[in-house]
């Protein structure tokens, strides 16, 4: 192969030693001469792998406590030397070609994440020689092979075994892309860290000025190209975080069905994040990013049946999320009753898979169990900029709630209030949710005035012949006027949960008292746009 390049000499210098010994042994078995530094060289030598210290190769010792090890012309000339062009210069300067470099970088992210990390700790974990070698090797990918991830060690060895000790241009180019992605992410982390800090009195100390850096750097990996975006004339792709550490649509495994669309992904995310709020068996049905039916049951089948009952019309072509293992009985109820785009659950039983398999186009996803929530950010693109905020993970406990009316909620009402409040958090503002016995009765979403959202919730309930009298109501934000309270009372709502905080709170409370309703304040708003 004319684009194949033989590996005769390799430089190995890694912070994470995972798999490096086996990689070195395999390279040695292929007749590759090994150069290395510091701890990596000691590991190889201690395990009987012949290795040349870089300082012996360059004739220059490591200096400044290891800060300068590989920054030498005999190293970078060997990496950057163009085969067929630079041989004379290399020979004149006693530079030998280095055909492969395996490097991973100082653990900067892990260091700054540790409690008590000082500026000095952070600075000493900024790798200099490593990124320089990575970039040099990736730049000269026409002739040299760069490996920055231990998962690629086997790939390189297998290719060498299949190509008489050589790697192909296709592989070198792909590894070069991974290398540039790696150094970009690394530099981005460093810039983000320093961009939040201001120096203190000591040159070795600093403190956080803001949790948001002055230049924001992040890196996402393309999971899949999408057929189109929100609309058919828009191109789209799905990118995910580098390290996903919680159950999500981004980390879910698709077990069957057509490829996920842009809207499928957005709606599935909304459904899954909502159902995660519940500890009892729960089902959430979403249409156009809004819950149209949510319920708790003694099991998932009952939860699904009750959620569907809220709004069967909107449930058609919807997304269904569960917070427990999907069983065959529940799966049968879904596929026999309605057209569904996506079903997602932490676990899907084999029997449930067999049931859904009869509907080949249904997208069935398994996301894994979730534990505690992890801190993360939300992004909203605006023309010319990006809004960044903490993800809304706030949720009040019953002990946080303040009863503001003369009438106290009953125990049953309080349970429904907490259920209703969790649902309202995931409904587009202005959001009004009616609920009774841990089941949504009506959902009013996205209206420009809060009173109209209340009217929509009432209309939805009436359309499905659901009894509103005795239900509770949740509002994602405060009521600016008493008209929303009057509308709720007219519909038969017995109890209201809302953040409070309006300049007319006293008037709102008086209206609730006038109607004999109970009302509680959470002190926390849940706008969703």
Swiss-Prot record:
Keyword Hydrolase part of the UniProt annotation: yes
GO molecular function, one term: phosphoribosylaminoimidazolecarboxamide formyltransferase activity
UniProt keyword list: Hydrolase, Multifunctional enzyme, Purine biosynthesis, Transferase
EC number assigned by the record: 2.1.2.3, 3.5.4.10
Keyword Metal-binding tagged: no
Annotated pathway: Purine metabolism; IMP biosynthesis via de novo pathway; 5-formamido-1-(5-phospho-D-ribosyl)imidazole-4-carboxamide from 5-amino-1-(5-phospho-D-ribosyl)imidazole-4-carboxamide (10-formyl THF route): step 1/1; Purine metabolism; IMP biosynthesis via de novo pathway; IMP from 5-formamido-1-(5-phospho-D-ribosyl)imidazole-4-carboxamide: step 1/1
SUPFAM superfamilies: Cytidine deaminase-like, Methylglyoxal synthase-like
Record-level GO BP terms: 'de novo' IMP biosynthetic process
Substrates-to-products reaction catalysed: (6R)-10-formyltetrahydrofolate + 5-amino-1-(5-phospho-beta-D-ribosyl)imidazole-4-carboxamide = 5-formamido-1-(5-phospho-D-ribosyl)imidazole-4-carboxamide + (6S)-5,6,7,8-tetrahydrofolate; IMP + H2O = 5-formamido-1-(5-phospho-D-ribosyl)imidazole-4-carboxamide
Annotated ranges, domain MGS-like: 1-148
Pfam families reported for this sequence: AICARFT_IMPCHas, MGS
Xref: Gene3D superfamilies: 3.40.140.20, Methylglyoxal synthase-like domain
GO cellular component: cytosol
Family statement: Belongs to the PurH family.
Domain notes: The IMP cyclohydrolase activity resides in the N-terminal region.
Name of protein: Bifunctional purine biosynthesis protein PurH
Gene: purH
């Amino acid at each position: 192969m004319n684009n194949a390049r033989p590996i005769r000499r390799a430089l190995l210098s890694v912070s994470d030693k995972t798999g490096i010994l086996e990689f070195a042994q395999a390279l040695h078995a292929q007749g590759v001469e090994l150069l290395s530094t510091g701890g990596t060289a000691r590991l190889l030598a201690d395990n009987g792998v012949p290795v040349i210290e870089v300082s012996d190769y360059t004739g220059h010792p490591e200096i400044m406590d290891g800060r300068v090890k590989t920054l030498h012309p005999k190293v970078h000339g060997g990496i950057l030397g163009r085969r067929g062009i630079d041989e004379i210069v290399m020979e004149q300067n006693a530079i030998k070609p280095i055909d492969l470099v395996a490097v991973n970088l100082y653990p900067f992210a892990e260091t700054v994440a540790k409690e008590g990390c000082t500026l000095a700790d952070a600075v000493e974990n900024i790798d200099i020689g490593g990124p320089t070698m990575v970039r040099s090797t990736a730049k000269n990918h026409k002739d040299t092979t760069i490996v920055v991830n231990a998962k690629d060690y086997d790939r390189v060895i297998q290719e060498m075994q299949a190509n008489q000790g050589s790697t192909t241009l296709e592989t070198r180019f792909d590894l070069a892309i991974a290398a540039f992605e790696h150094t970009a992410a690394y530099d981005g982390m460093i810039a983000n860290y320093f961009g939040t800090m201001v120096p203190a009195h000591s040159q070795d100390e600093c403190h956080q000025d803001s949790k948001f850096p002055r230049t924001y750097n992040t890196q996402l990996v393309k999971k899949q190209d999408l057929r189109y975006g929100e609309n058919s004339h828009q191109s789209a792709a799905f990118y995910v975080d580098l390290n996903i550490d919680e159950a999500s649509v981004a980390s879910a495994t698709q077990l069957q069905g057509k490829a996920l669309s842009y809207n499928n992904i957005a709606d599935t995310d909304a459904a899954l994040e909502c159902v995660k709020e519940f500890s009892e068996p729960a089902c959430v049905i979403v249409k156009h990013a809004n819950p149209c039916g949510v319920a708790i049951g003694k099991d998932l089948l009952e939860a699904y049946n009750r959620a569907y009952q809220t709004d069967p019309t909107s449930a058609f072509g919807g997304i269904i999320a569960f917070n427990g293992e999907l069983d065959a009985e529940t799966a049968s109820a879904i596929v026999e009753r309605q057209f569904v785009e996506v079903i997602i659950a932490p676990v899907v039983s084999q029997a449930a898979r067999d049931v859904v398999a009869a509907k080949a186009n249904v997208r069935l996803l398994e996301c894994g169990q979730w534990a505690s929530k992890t801190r993360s950010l939300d992004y909203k693109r605006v023309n010319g900029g990006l809004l960044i905020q903490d993800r809304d993970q706030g949720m009040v406990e019953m002990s946080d709630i303040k009863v503001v009316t003369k009438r106290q909620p009953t125990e049953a009402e309080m349970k429904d209030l907490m259920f209703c409040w969790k649902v309202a958090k995931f409904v587009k503002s202005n959001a009004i949710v009616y609920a009774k016995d841990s089941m949504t009765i009506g959902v009013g979403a996205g209206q420009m005035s809060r009173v109209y959202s209340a009217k929509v919730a009432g209309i939805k309930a009436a359309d499905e012949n659901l009894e509103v009298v005795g239900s509770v109501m949740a509002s994602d934000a405060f009521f600016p006027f008493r008209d929303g309270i009057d509308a709720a009372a007219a519909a038969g709502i017995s109890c209201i949960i809302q953040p409070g905080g309006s300049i007319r709170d006293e008037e709102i409370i008086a209206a609730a008292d006038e109607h004999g309703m109970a009302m509680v304040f959470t002190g926390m708003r849940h706008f969703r746009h």
